[in-house]
């Protein structure tokens, strides 16, 4: 099966936004990405070799999914995304959906985590035809344990609100906090073998790199 060129799709989406969005909004988003690059405490985020925290979270169907149960079946890919309102997140989720047969060949499974309410997670799963677990991390509790959470500045709060993307209504809390997009590969002994953390939400872990990490793990 051909692997989706996620990097190319993300770049095309970025160019389309720059072409069609108001110049002031494009400049605002660019400046806030650079600001986050300098202020985000990357050293505090979990990295390769760290032990992943145990967690249990509600899924989009009303059940509960635990990392420990998933690890009993093999390696787990855990990806933190901002929410179904983010088009870059949706591109990533669709590309990872297409990877599921390859993941299964390594005995691996996928968990996607965002701070949005379960109803919003269900909408995301249905709209994007996702068959892996889409989990709701209310209050960013698990993302915080991974060291990924940051608050949005007022300008971004205003911009999202004006675009009908007010986070308090989507996430069910007034914190205006999000996780930095990140993808981890976690081994059955709960160790992190790959950590991809990127403050620029327009960049995500390429499917090819994810498969390479699983391949490397399979032969070690």
PLM features per residue range, with description:
Residues 1-51:
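N-terminal targeting signals for export/organelle localization
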Residues 4, 40, 123, 135, ...:
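Non-catalytic interaction/Regulatory regions outside core domains
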Residues 51, 75, 178-180:
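Short, small/polar residue-rich loop motifs at catalytic or cofactor-binding pockets
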Residues 58-60, 186:
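A generic structural motif
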Residues 67-96:
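Short active-site neighborhood of thiol/selenol oxidoreductases, capturing the structured segment around
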Residues 92-145:
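Structural microenvironment flanking redox-active thiols in thiol-disulfide oxidoreductases
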Residues 137-203:
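Thiol/selenol-based redox catalytic cores and closely related redox-interacting motifs
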Residues 199-217:
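A short, polar/charged loop-to-alpha-helix boundary motif
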């Amino acid at each position: 099966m051909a692997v989706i060129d996620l990097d190319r799709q993300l770049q095309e989406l970025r160019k389309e936004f720059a072409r069609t969005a108001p110049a002031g909004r494009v400049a605002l988003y660019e400046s806030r990405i650079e600001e986050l690059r300098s202020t985000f405490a990357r050293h505090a985020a979990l990295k390769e070799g760290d032990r992943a925290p145990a967690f249990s979270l509600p899924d989009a169907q009303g059940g509960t999914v635990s990392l420990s149960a998933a690890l009993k079946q093999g390696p787990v890919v855990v990806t933190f995304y901002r929410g179904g309102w983010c088009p870059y997140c949706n591109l990533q989720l669709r590309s990872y959906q297409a990877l599921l047969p390859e993941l299964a060949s390594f005995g691996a499974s996928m968990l996607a985590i965002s701070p949005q309410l379960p109803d919003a997670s269900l909408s995301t799963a249905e709209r994007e035809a996702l068959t892996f677990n889409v989990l709701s991390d209310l209050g960013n509790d698990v993302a915080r344990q991974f060291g990924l959470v940051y608050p949005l500045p007022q300008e971004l709060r205003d911009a999202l609100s004006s675009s009908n993307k007010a986070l308090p209504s989507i996430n069910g809390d007034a914190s205006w906090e999000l996780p930095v997009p990140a993808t981890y590969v976690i081994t059955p002994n709960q160790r992190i073998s790959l950590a991809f953390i990127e403050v620029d939400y327009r960049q995500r872990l390429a499917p090819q790199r994810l498969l390479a990490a699983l391949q490397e793990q399979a032969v070690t």
